[in-house]
Amino acid sequence: MEKFEGYSEKHKSRQQYFVYPLLFQEYIYAFAHDYGLNDSEPVEIVSRNNKKFSSLLVKRLIIRMYQQNFGINLVNHPNQDRLLDYKIGFYSEFYSQILSEGFAIVVEIPFSLRELPCPKEKEIPKFQNLRSIHSIFPFLEDTFLHLDYLSHIEIPYPIHLEILVQLLQYRIQDVPSLHLLRFFLNYYSNWNSFITSMKSIFIFKKENKRLFRFLYNSYLSEYEFFLLFLRKQSSCLPLASSGTFLERIHFSRKMEHFGIMYPGFFRKTIWFFMDPLMHYVRYQGKAIFASKGTLFFNKKWKWYLIHLWQYFFSFWTQPRRIHLNQLANSCFDFMGYLSSVPKSPLLVRNQMLENSFLIDTRMPKFDTIVPVTALIGYLSKAQFCTGSGHPISKPIWTDLSDWDILDRFGRICRNLFHYHSGSSKKRTLYRLKYILRLSCARTLARKHKSTVRTFMQRLGSAFLEEFFTEEELVFSLMFTKTTLFSFCGSHSERIWYFDIIRINDLVKPLN
């Protein structure tokens, strides 16, 4: 109780009150524009008519914001293409998009202040390479060997938009800013219904990427706050009345009242929460919850998560979104790999004096393989091959130079091998490599109006082989990447690199 109250007071002391006036500062929108230019995923403030960002537009926007009828006009006429001032010719969508980018910058300020290091706290050294996606796999390899069950969770989404605003009220107590946020959400969807229309959420996500990511991360932060706190501190999870705790406001007061009714529950911590063999990993809207225990124990956690979303976030999620499987008998899709923990036979020769005998035992092994069907599907969607994996030419690239064609094919091939270097079976990668090499040859042959055989005889297959196996020297945290993948190599050696920070490099070049 004291720990939670202390956390709540510390959490409350960092709430921000006066955020709205920053929206009237021109430099805020300049920050938003510079962020879009320097971001790894460039987000340019562009309207549907390709009207780009300028300080003059921002000044006119701020003038309109000071006018009392600006918000009324947008709310009363959300479907009109133009505002009342037809001479200016600005679209209402463009104004809303600029505002959303500036609003996202402003509301991120309180959360950025929380990340500032405290002078009294010991500074934790930061290693850039620890951001690597591959750094999680050695952790899974060490821990999952001792676990029994795994729950693959599809985090419910989308949710009711009003809940997103209510979640921000715990961090930002600025009424005008929250009203402005409601205006954005009301502009892109029907306010009186659940946002089940994927068309409206797609438009909002596409035109307001920064704001959308901020709202979604706030929702995940609040959800994981309860998940982590209750797992560590509470002992009343199995009770049916635990739904009374799932309200953020006056949380400690309700726990204190419940502790009077059931004083014995708060004097001890049961193994249900404090079992050290429980691990939670979240990635790309999904999560993995692995633990050691019985099937009944893991089913409790499954229904706890369902009730958490139902009572606190006020929406119902289907139980089928949480798949509970036994690790030894199933595999799971994780970060582009099909992972499993099978029990492999192991023969051990034991020598005792003059007698020797063999001991046949079964040891669990963390196995990672490449999902060949999914990757061939990506290649087929990008028109490198057919659905069955037969290589074809890419006509859209025939207008490029020979070097550009080779560079694009080579980059995709190296990305595939670099990201999936942790696979325990490399033969699948060699098949994908063959598809890309032959597709590249057919594209070049089509450009020069020749056959593949004639083209390969003229250039030679050694040139393509050398091109696709060439890799840049990448320095990682532990070692230097020097291994080159070729057809004559180890088929079982797994290598995890510490320079991979995004999974999008695997799929997006194919689109």
From Swiss-Prot:
Keyword tRNA processing (UniProt):
yes
* Coiled-coil stretches: none
Q: What is its main location?
A: plastid
| Key word tRNA processing present | yes
| Highest taxon, organism lineage | Eukaryota
One molecular function GO term is:
RNA binding
Q: Which UniProt keywords apply?
A: Chloroplast, mRNA processing, Plastid, RNA-binding, tRNA processing
Gene Ontology cellular component terms for the protein in this record: chloroplast
Q: Which InterPro entries match?
A: Domain_X, Maturase_MatK, Maturase_MatK_N
One GO BP annotation of this record: tRNA processing
**Cell location:** Plastid, Chloroplast
Family recorded in the similarity comment: Belongs to the intron maturase 2 family. MatK subfamily.
Q: What does this protein do?
A: Usually encoded in the trnK tRNA gene intron. Probably assists in splicing its own and other chloroplast group II introns.
Which PANTHER family would you find in this protein's record?
MATURASE K
Q: What is this protein called?
A: Maturase K
Annotated source species? Poa pratensis (Kentucky bluegrass)
Lineage runs: Eukaryota, Viridiplantae, Streptophyta, Embryophyta, Tracheophyta
